[in-house]
């Protein structure tokens, strides 16, 4: 478990407070210390989301002072993954230097064709240079070119000041909509997904409001065409009607960039899964690790089987400080996954995502068989992992 910085900030200062006073900052420190004392493995930042997006770099460093010199990791969805992604990484290198504690950049990527094959190599180079200077910074990646998050993430982050109910109310205002549209048509100072990849690559994957669920699995461009609207109007109408409770799957990244990240010796693999109770899952919920093994190891030969397994086990355990996980050795937890690489197959797809992978037939958790001959044994030996 990680302590969520956004939740901590919202508890201390509300959802839409850009500037923090001394009492609010002190409460953030207290809550971080409380979560770490309870066993949190680290602190997770979402700088691309409200309310974390309201931190300046200086205020962020101040908020994270309880982690200074601790060796406790900070994981981060950076402030940008689009045209400003390299500068966003530089910001996190600055944070890592100031706090002298590890930073793990979550799901590293470069969004948009204009940034593919250009920003990712630069970021890998910058992290390597920082490590040579003694800075602990690395990254993880998921093996899919599509991401998934809340649909409001296509809007400028300042639109979420006050929370989603306030945003829903504001979307009823034509002037507010027009201002959003103007920002989204040209803005490069935020992760402007609609500009970078187009509405045809932004799919509404789950919608809370039942009478709108006919649009699940359709792109915003397709919804707009059906409704006879422009894509901005269709987007704003959908968000307003659903009280902003809509998730998306967005096709944003380049497979060659994923290969470059996987080849980096310091990267890990992440599923970055979310679990909506309605609509369409992202196939990574079921298929991340077999996609890595089947597609990137066996088919593309982007990395060796040994390296791939290490990124999912030993490397990941080291990053999170899990001292009894990740390797096979006396005294370690006996967590084993036995598979034949030639038989591994990802069954989950974007159109049919809730499908178990094939080939993962024997799994032990804490030395007890959880899956034998491909069937669940009923054993539930897993425990909550704490620091």
Where are these regions (language model features)?
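Active-site neighborhoods of metal-dependent hydrolases
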Residues: 1-22, 26-50, 64, 94-97, ...
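Divalent metal-coordination and catalytic microenvironments
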Residues: 39, 77, 140, 228, ...
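Acidic-and-aromatic substrate-binding clefts and catalytic sites of carbohydrate-active enzymes
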Residues: 52-55, 80-86, 113-116
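Short glycine/threonine-rich loop-to-helix capping motif typified by GTGT followed
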Residues: 54-59, 117-119, 249, 283-284, ...
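Alpha-helix-loop-beta-strand connector modules within alpha/beta enzyme cores
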Residues: 61-72, 76
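C-terminal cap of metal-dependent C-N hydrolases
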Residues: 173, 260-266, 271-272, 288, ...
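Acidic, glycine-enriched loop/beta-strand segments at the rims
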Residues: 246-252, 256-258, 304-309, 317-354
């Amino acid at each position: 478990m990680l302590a969520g910085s956004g939740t901590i900030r919202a508890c201390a200062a509300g959802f839409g407070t850009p500037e923090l006073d001394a009492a609010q900052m002190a409460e953030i420190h207290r809550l971080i210390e409380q979560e770490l004392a309870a066993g949190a493995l680290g602190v997770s930042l979402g700088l691309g989301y409200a309310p974390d997006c309201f931190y300046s770099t200086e205020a962020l460093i101040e908020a994270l002072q309880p982690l200074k010199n601790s060796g406790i990791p900070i994981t981060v969805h950076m402030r940008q993954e689009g045209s400003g992604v390299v500068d966003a990484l530089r910001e996190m290198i600055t944070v890592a230097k100031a706090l002298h504690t590890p930073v793990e950049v979550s799901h590293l990527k470069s969004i948009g064709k204009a940034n593919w094959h250009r920003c990712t190599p630069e970021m890998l180079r910058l992290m390597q240079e920082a490590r040579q200077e003694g800075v602990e910074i690395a990254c993880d990646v998921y093996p899919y070119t599509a991401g998934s998050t809340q649909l409001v993430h296509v809007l400028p982050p300042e639109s979420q000041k006050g929370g989603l109910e306030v945003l829903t109310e504001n979307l009823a205002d034509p002037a507010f909509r027009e201002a959003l549209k103007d920002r989204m048509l040209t803005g490069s100072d935020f992760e402007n997904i609609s500009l970078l990849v187009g509405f045809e690559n932004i799919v509404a994957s789950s919608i809370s409001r039942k009478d709108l669920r006919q649009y699940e699995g359709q792109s915003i461009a397709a919804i707009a065409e059906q409704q006879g609207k422009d894509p901005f109007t269709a987007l704003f109408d959908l968000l307003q009607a659903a009280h902003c409770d809509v998730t998306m799957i967005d096709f944003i990244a380049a497979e060659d960039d994923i290969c470059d990240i996987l080849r980096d010796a310091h990267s890990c693999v992440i599923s970055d899964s979310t679990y909506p109770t309605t609509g369409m899952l992202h196939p990574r919920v079921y298929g991340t690790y077999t996609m890595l093994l089947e597609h990137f190891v066996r088919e593309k030969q982007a990395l060796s089987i040994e390296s791939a397994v290490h990124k999912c086990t030993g490397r990941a355990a080291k990053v999170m400080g899990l001292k009894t996980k990740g390797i096979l050795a006396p005294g370690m937890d006996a967590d084993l996954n036995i598979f034949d690489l030639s038989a591994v197959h990802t069954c989950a797809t974007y159109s049919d995502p809730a499908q178990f992978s094939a080939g993962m037939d024997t799994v032990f958790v804490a030395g007890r068989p959880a899956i034998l001959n491909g069937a669940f044994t009923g054993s539930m030996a897993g425990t909550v992992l704490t620091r």
